[in-house]
């Protein structure tokens, strides 16, 4: 059965909240310098060097798109997991690794 828009937004919002919570913990524990801007369908992370990671919800496709300085990625929800459409990698480990590579900040997601 296809996912409804309401289900998509609930899953995506839960994931956005988990990322925000992990970053706030890193700010507290590691004195990490990250600006978090959550606005509508977009979660933007800006690091001390000015680089950004932008995560946004693509409602018509029921996908999460991520832009890092290393490239753009599309994640779809498959069997209870957000998976990269190209290589099948899971979303949360990908975000964790991208933040580490881009900023040196270690998150617990």
From Swiss-Prot:
Keywords: Iron, Metal-binding. GO terms for cellular component: cytosol. GO terms for biological process: iron-sulfur cluster assembly. It comes from the Bacteria. The keyword Iron applies. GO terms for molecular function: ferric iron binding; ferrous iron binding. Gene3D superfamilies: Frataxin/CyaY (3.30.920.10). PANTHER family: FRATAXIN, FRATAXIN, MITOCHONDRIAL. Belongs to the frataxin family. Involved in iron-sulfur (Fe-S) cluster assembly. May act as a regulator of Fe-S biogenesis. This is Iron-sulfur cluster assembly protein CyaY.
């Amino acid at each position: 059965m296809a996912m409804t828009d309401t289900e998509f937004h609930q899953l995506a919002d839960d994931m956005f909240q988990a990322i925000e919570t992990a970053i706030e913990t890193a700010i507290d524990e590691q004195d990490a310098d990250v600006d978090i801007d959550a606005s509508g369908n977009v979660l933007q992370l800006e690091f001390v060097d000015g680089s950004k990671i932008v995560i946004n919800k693509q409602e018509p496709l029921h996908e999460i798109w991520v832009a890092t300085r290393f490239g753009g990625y599309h994640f779809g929800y498959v069997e209870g997991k957000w998976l990269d459409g190209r290589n099948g990698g899971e979303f949360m480990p990908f975000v964790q690794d991208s933040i580490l590579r881009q900023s040196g900040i270690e998150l617990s997601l």
